[in-house]
């Protein structure tokens, strides 16, 4: 794979009704209903809204045979009114349901974690090699008849692995690792290959963007080693709602799309399903617009490991680089110095003059030719000011340069000035590739100067900025190249929105935490409580608990598994009933929905993690995710 130049991975074509996937086809957009699948009228109406918004596939939960059989009625309801969208059945726990669904849906999604293996209980299981082989044979014996039904009905299959629902068998042998997730998928793919069943799509998802990106990269590598080219379905599970859901999805999905991986995407938002479609479309269009871009002549650093990257080794300069958290730079050249009360930048670029009033705890950056060494200020140079940089005695300097200006003279200057922090600029259509090329070239040259990525936009809506900036920063963060972020926007957005987006990107990439994190699913027909209003109530009660991770899950499919990545969890347990978790341990079951948020707060308080709300505008508590 070329790290610096965009092209899509070549994949096999899969027929899904009249909307083929993979191969020469465009990246497809899809969503999932959250209405009860036995409610034909509600499902048809919601599916139409998804299609009208631009969705190309509609998935429905089929938790039982009755739901699977009702897909026929939903199909009739759609087709009789001119909606020919392929339907995808989502199956967990019961392979018999998959057999039935394959007769009515254009595609069936099965979950390797619970297709034959029992549901996850977090028990450590011991197998001899012979016993483990026998378990694999059980999968084959059950899976092959299902594939035969799919062949007879021209039904495609998605093998959909979720981080939150790996089986105890896989967990016991491989641990909670990307390798385990990949093997969970490959066990089923090998059977498909043996049976010459090729209408297969794969997904490996997690709410943890780092795990999701690393696992998909590894899966593609393993498939290539075994001669497979199945298309990929991308998504970040439980991404959440609003700003958080958009940034997290853009970061994870965008990082993979930027590397040419992915044939269909679903942006999982805890909102109405049709609201996911415009976000997904913007993300796909932004990435694919860089096709046939001018070539970037980059050189990969010799010690870089794409499948398991570590943070690039840099020399710390004050609080930038080394083991420090990535910093946030912000622009205030328009003279408006307001800051977000929760997300105050570490450095503010003021340009030609300091503001009359400065923000406590904030450092300021001035153009080098007007910098006079004022307290808490630092000079900024461009690549044409190397002589001025040589005569400057500041212990921290910022050098703004694009990759194509990284000449021998600039490299030589950086070797003489380890106190210089490089601010990488790019106006290239593939700015991810050019930023990568600069960071790799510094490493090739033996330089350990920290790198901050300057991203220039002209957006008028927060959503557009969140999608584009998230997609641009994803690969750079997951590659371990990011020592800081600088978002510059010439649209109508306030500085507060831009700053919040920058901090949100660092949190979504798990390299700097500055607020409460929510792991919330989008809901489906299994969800038996009002997910959106519940999320709003939980956020209202806990949004000030910075650094805490709270899971809000509609059902038990991924709920308990995702709790391993959360501090506390709120999981649907039945109609109007909720279970509460402390990490992956269920603390209290079957709480009435109307009491559950209050009980959650009591649980957080009992464990000493609750703080009363204050009106303080102090900087947020921060910690690094390990």
From Swiss-Prot:
GO biological process terms held by the UniProt record: isopentenyl diphosphate biosynthetic process, methylerythritol 4-phosphate pathway; terpenoid biosynthetic process
Pathway: Isoprenoid biosynthesis; isopentenyl diphosphate biosynthesis via DXP pathway; isopentenyl diphosphate from 1-deoxy-D-xylulose 5-phosphate: step 5/6
Regions annotated as coiled coil: none
Cofactor names: [4Fe-4S] cluster
Disulfide links within the chain: none
Binding note for cofactor: Binds 1 [4Fe-4S] cluster.
Keywords for the protein's UniProt record, in alphabetical order: 4Fe-4S, Iron, Iron-sulfur, Isoprene biosynthesis, Metal-binding, Oxidoreductase
Gene that encodes the chain: ispG
GO terms for MF: 4 iron, 4 sulfur cluster binding; 4-hydroxy-3-methylbut-2-en-1-yl diphosphate synthase activity (ferredoxin); 4-hydroxy-3-methylbut-2-enyl-diphosphate synthase activity (flavodoxin); iron ion binding
Function noted in UniProt: Converts 2C-methyl-D-erythritol 2,4-cyclodiphosphate (ME-2,4cPP) into 1-hydroxy-2-methyl-2-(E)-butenyl 4-diphosphate.
Class of enzymatic activity (EC top level): oxidoreductase
Protein name according to UniProt: 4-hydroxy-3-methylbut-2-en-1-yl diphosphate synthase (flavodoxin)
């Amino acid at each position: 794979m070329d790290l610096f130049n965009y092209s899509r991975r070549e994949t096999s074509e899969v027929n899904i009704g009249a909307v083929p996937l993979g191969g020469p086809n465009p990246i497809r957009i899809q969503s999932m209903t959250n209405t009860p699948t036995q409610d034909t009228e509600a499902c048809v109406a919601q599916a139409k809204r998804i299609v009208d918004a631009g969705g190309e596939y509609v998935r429905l939960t089929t938790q039982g045979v009755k739901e699977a059989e009702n897909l026929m009625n939903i199909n009739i309801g759609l087709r009789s009114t001119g909606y020919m969208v392929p339907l995808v059945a989502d199956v967990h726990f019961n392979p018999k349901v998959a057999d039935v669904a394959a007769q009515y849906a254009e595609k069936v999604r099965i979950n390797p974690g619970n297709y034959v293996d029992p549901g996850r209980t977090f028990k450590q299981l011991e197998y001899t090699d012979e016993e483990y082989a026998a378990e694999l044979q059980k999968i084959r014996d059950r899976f092959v008849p299902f594939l035969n039904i799919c062949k007879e009905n021209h039904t495609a299959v998605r093998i959909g692995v979720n981080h939150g629902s790996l089986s105890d068998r896989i967990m016991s042998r491989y641990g909670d690792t990307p390798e385990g997730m990949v093997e969970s998928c490959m066990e089923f793919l090998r059977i498909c290959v043996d049976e010459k069943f090729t209408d297969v799509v794969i997904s490996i998802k997690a709410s943890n963007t780092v795990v999701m990106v690393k696992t998909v990269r590894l899966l593609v590598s393993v498939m290539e080693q075994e001669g497979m080219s199945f298309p990929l379905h991308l998504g970040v599970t439980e991404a959440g709602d609003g700003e958080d859901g958009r940034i997290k999805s853009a970061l994870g999905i965008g990082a993979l799309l930027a590397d040419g991986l992915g044939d269909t995407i679903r942006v999982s938002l805890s909102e109405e399903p049709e609201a996911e479609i415009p976000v997904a479309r913007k993300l796909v269009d932004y990435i694919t617009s860089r096709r046939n871009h001018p070539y970037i002549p980059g050189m990969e650093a010799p010690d870089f490991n794409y499948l398991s990257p570590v943070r690039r080794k840099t020399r710390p300069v004050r609080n930038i680089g080394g083991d420090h958290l990535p910093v946030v730079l912000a622009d205030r050249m328009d003279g408006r110095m307001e800051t977000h009360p929760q997300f105050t930048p570490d450095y503010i670029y003021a340009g030609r003059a300091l503001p009359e009033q400065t923000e406590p705890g904030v450092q300021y950056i001035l153009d080098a030719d007007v910098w006079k060494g004022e307290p808490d200020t630092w000079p900024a140079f461009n690549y044409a000011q190397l002589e001025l940089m040589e005569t400057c005695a500041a212990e921290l300097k910022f050098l703004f340069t694009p990759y194509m200006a990284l000449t021998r003279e600039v490299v030589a200057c950086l070797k003489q000035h380890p106190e210089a922090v490089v601010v990488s600029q790019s106006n290239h259509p593939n700015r991810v590739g050019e930023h990568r090329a600069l960071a790799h070239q510094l490493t090739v040259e033996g330089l350990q100067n920290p790198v901050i990525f300057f991203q220039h936009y002209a957006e008028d809506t927060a959503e557009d900025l969140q999608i584009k900036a998230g997609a641009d920063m994803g690969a750079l963060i997951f590659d371990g190249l990011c020592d800081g972020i600088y978002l510059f926007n010439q649209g109508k957005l306030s500085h507060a929105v831009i700053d919040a987006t920058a901090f949100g990107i660092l949190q979504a990439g798990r390299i700097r935490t500055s607020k409460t994190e929510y792991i919330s699913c989008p809901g489906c027909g299994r969800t038996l409580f009002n997910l959106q209003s519940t999320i709003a109530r939980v956020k209202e009660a806990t949004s000030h608990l910075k650094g805490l991770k709270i899971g809000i899950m509609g059902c038990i499919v991924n709920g308990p598994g995702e709790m391993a990545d959360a501090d506390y969890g709120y999981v649907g347990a039945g109609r109007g009933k909720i279970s509460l978790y402390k990490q992956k341990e269920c603390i209290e079951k079957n709480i009435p929905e109307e009491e559950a948020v209050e009980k959650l707060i009591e649980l957080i308080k009992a464990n000493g993690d609750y703080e009363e709300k204050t009106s303080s505008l102090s900087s947020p508590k921060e910690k690094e995710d390990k």
